[in-house]
Regions:
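Feature recognizes metal-dependent phosphohydrolase scaffolds
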Residues: 1-662
Length: 662
């Protein structure tokens, strides 16, 4: 017999009784929750480092990392030809566009509707089978909710039921609603195929469509993000950190991909172009010609030259503002990154760590050698305009709000610890203390938590003004500071890569986390420190591209660490040999899905091309995981315990039953 402290819990029980005012209702809820505990766990998808590649990312969401294709093969493997299965998959991924094509080419459209509707219902029935009817119902569009429920839950083995289903299908067609129904059920299939999506950072970067991805995520049913270094850079820009604004613009120009800045957010770059053309009119800006792996292959020579001038102009301003911030915050210990003062402008040389290096060029018309970090009056005016553009961009601030609502520095879910890049360590593998606030040091979980709080402080207008100013400044440390959990390298050698040919200066020494993360004991120590328990616990990261062509393995530390940056970004395709990973965690275990490069949405619609994916089984269980085995299961058991206490209180007269108010 359970012992309850009814008097102590009375206030809570009275509140709970408002939702379940009778013994019957409380009992029914316990039965429902117990039933949910025994369903298979939902499928979690883990993606990382999307870098603005919206077409590939959205396609992976639509095909559920190949899961929908697998379902179609299982259902129709022997009854449909390969081409027909491909057509059906494309219809599920891109229903509106595919319907347009079908109607142009199909001689008997009603017959096609009849067959296709039955096929779609079969796929939907399969993907919905692991959910409660209530959860499926909540996923359905209002217009077709009742009809889809009827079709999903009628078994066609019964002859009378077959006739009933056929009448529903015929009526959908005869009333001219077939297209709308197909679009609705295709979207339901997409939604139910992924129960929970985890993005391990870097929605933003050089790709053309970070804004398109965030428009999609604003309305996505269930997702979270562990912020990456590029996300935090854009958050810093939105918060008003001018060094972050310069970095964001510089990276876009480096890859000649201005779509997110100009088309997505309407950032006006004309003042920068005007300034750059004048200030660098006599400069070849050879080091600043955009990378061909971005959008540069599609621009003419004149535009390329202008892009290079803008690129150099913003880079010089960036180095100046970073120099100012480093001087303002000596506690960051980044003084070595103030490089302008070490340039001999006449000899065109620079001294770094006691060594003299020749520079590729030394044309800096806006630098005053006596005060090298001071912006010229024209640069000041330009930064005022750019700062204003970022601060008044409503869409950017909406997207950053979405990132704050759904994101944090780390997440612990179902015995998995998720973070984008690093957890700073000492040489012996112990957790490294990092100074976030002046005079305050944190390590491990507390470091991640305090960093996340610092980021949020930058966006809270009611914060202490000095604390908020520091939080806004701190974004640049998170981007390139040596002990930042989002960087964790000795330096960011941006200046050296532009101006020094000697590759030795380009080296960025990785922090101890990256050097020790293949050690199972180190990974266990980190998980212990974060309170991650369970026999099948893991750390999941992104950030560092896995170069499969060089034989690198995404599975490390005897299976306890998984690195899933496979290179969504086109710039990394040649390096990684693939175009991204999805880690899929379903009721049977973990599978790592390796994607080949995506051609285009147009190609997928016209020719039915899908992303070719190879699946590697990482960890399989001989027992199917249930909701009871997950974090949600723990929460449901607590709810059941509370309801059982309420039943006891009802039956022993501590709380009175009442009629539900109509």
């Amino acid at each position: 017999m359970k012992h309850y402290e009814i008097n102590k819990d009375m206030r809570y029980l009275q509140l709970l009784a408002q939702s379940f005012p009778t013994v019957a209702e409380a009992s029914t809820e316990i039965i429902n929750l117990q039933a949910i505990l025994n369903l298979p766990k939902g499928t979690e998808h883990f993606l990382a480092d999307i870098h603005g590649e919206y077409e590939a990312f959205l396609h992976v969401l639509k095909n559920a990392s190949g899961n929908i294709k697998r379902k179609v093969n299982e259902l129709f493997g022997n009854t449909l030809r390969e081409a027909e299965k491909r057509e059906l998959c494309t219809l599920i991924y891109y229903p509106e566009q595919k319907l347009e094509l079908v109607k142009q080419n199909e001689p008997d459209i009603n017959d096609w509707y009849h067959i296709t509707l039955h096929q779609l219902v079969a796929v939907c029935r399969d993907v919905s089978s692991k959910y409660t009817r209530s959860k499926v119902r909540k996923s359905l569009p209002c217009d077709f909710s009742y009809i889809i429920q009827e079709l999903l839950h009628e078994h066609t083995e019964d002859h009378d039921k077959t006739a009933y289903v056929n009448v529903i299908v015929d009526t959908i067609i005869s009333t001219g609603r077939a297209d709308d129904f197909i679009i609705a059920i295709a979207n339901v299939i997409q939604r139910l195929a992924i129960d929970q999506l985890h993005i391990l950072g870097d929605i933003y970067d050089r790709g053309p469509g970070a804004h398109i991805i965030l428009d999609k995520m604003r309305h996505y049913h269930s997702w979270d993000i562990q912020w990456g270094n590029h996300d935090v850079l854009w958050m810093g820009a939105a918060a008003g950190n001018d060094a972050c604004i310069c970095n964001v613009i510089r990276l876009s120009l480096r890859y000649a991909n201005l779509a997110t800045l100009e088309e997505g957010y309407g950032i006006n770059l004309i003042p920068l172009a005007t300034f750059a053309m004048e200030a660098y009119k006599d400069d070849e800006c050879a080091e600043f010609i955009p990378k061909m792996s971005g959008g540069a292959a599609d621009i003419d020579e004149k535009t390329q030259r202008l892009t290079a001038q803008m690129h150099k102009a913003i880079a010089v301003i960036q180095f100046k503002i970073e120099g100012q911030l480093i001087a303002k915050h000596p506690e960051w210990k980044m003084d070595k990154r103030r490089l302008f003062e070490h340039i001999d402008y006449e000899k065109k040389e620079i001294e770094i760590d006691g060594k003299i290096y020749p520079m590729t060029s030394c044309h800096f018309p806006t630098i005053n050698p006596a005060s090298p970090y001071e912006l010229s009056s024209e640069e000041e005016l330009l930064m005022t305009k750019l700062h204003h553009s970022f601060m008044v961009c409503e869409k950017l601030h909406k997207h950053i709000k979405v990132m704050l609502q759904h994101g944090c520095m780390y997440t612990i879910i179902n015995d998995n610890l998720l973070f984008h890049a690093s957890c700073p360590l000492n040489e012996d593998g112990s957790l490294k203390e990092v100074e976030i606030f002046p005079g305050k040091k944190f390590a491990g979980r507390e470091l991640m938590h305090q960093t996340g709080m610092q980021i949020r402080t930058a966006f809270q207008s009611d914060s202490d003004p000095k604390e908020r100013e520091y939080a806004i400044d701190y974004f640049i440390y998170l981007w390139c500071g040596p002990d930042s959990p989002l960087f964790d390298k000795s330096k960011m050698a941006t200046f050296e890569r532009y101006f020094i040919n000697d590759k030795e200066t380009h080296k960025e020494e990785k922090g101890y986390y990256f050097l020790l993360r293949d050690d199972e004991q180190v990974i266990d120590h980190i998980m212990d420190a974060f309170g991650v328990t369970g026999p099948n616990r893991h750390i999941i990261n992104g950030h560092v591209p896995v170069r499969t062509t060089k034989g690198e393995n995404p599975i490390k530390a005897n299976g306890k660490l998984m690195v899933i940056d496979g290179g969504f970004s086109k710039a990394y395709h040649n390096e990684t040999g693939i175009a991204g990973y999805t880690l899929v965690y379903h009721s049977r275990g973990f599978q790592l899905v390796q994607h080949e490069p995506f051609t285009s949405m147009e190609d997928a619609i016209l020719r039915g091309t899908d992303i070719k994916s190879t699946t590697q089984i990482v960890e399989m269980s001989n027992r199917r995981m249930l909701v009871a085995d997950t974090d949600i299961g723990q929460e449901l058991r607590k709810q059941i315990a509370d309801l059982e206490e309420l039943l006891y209180a009802y039956r022993h007269g501590f709380v009175k039953e009442s009629e539900r108010k109509k």
